Regions:
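Short beta-strand scaffold segments in enzyme catalytic cores
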Residues: 27-33
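Compact, glycine-rich, soluble single-domain proteins
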Residues: 42-57
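Feature captures the catalytic cores and cofactor-binding loops of soluble hydro-lyases/lyases
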Residues: 58, 62-63, 85
């Protein structure tokens, strides 16, 4: 992992150090912006599942507010026992990232290790908003 991406891993881990709660805040994400800034987001679980907010979505919102394109993404999951793992975005977050951070790379499982892949590779056949004639 490059030094800039390791910084993202550390930023996401710091969020979990400060805010982790089992079943409520288990994932943190950090995004590097083109201007060098790092924004973070935290998973916020709701009692009604669909109302929950993923860490990647929260961080992406912060990136949009910051006004600079996203270049790299790292997500970290903490298990109740304290172990932490890199985690790839869920399908909904992959859709959002495809719409708003398509030029970025995201860390995911690649074979037996982790590595950065282009966001469009997360969902190579994702839906597009434009209507297509049948």
């Amino acid at each position: 992992m490059s030094a800039p991406d390791r910084e993202l891993l550390e930023a996401a881990s710091a969020i979990l150090d400060a805010r982790y709660r089992t079943g409520v805040h288990e994932v943190a994400a950090a995004l590097r912006l083109a201007d060098g800034r790092v924004v973070t987001g935290l998973h916020v679980e709701a009692s009604a599942g669909r109302a929950s907010v993923c860490a990647e979505s929260a961080a992406l919102s912060a990136a949009v507010v910051a006004g600079s394109p996203v270049v790299s993404i790292v997500g970290v999951l903490q298990r109740p026992g304290g172990s932490r793992h890199l985690i790839e975005p869920c399908g909904v977050c992959a859709e959002l990232l495809g719409d708003h951070a398509a030029a970025a790379t995201v860390w995911v499982a690649v074979a037996d290790a982790f590595g950065p892949v282009p966001v469009p590779d997360l969902l190579p056949h994702r839906r597009r908003r434009a209507a297509r004639p049948v």
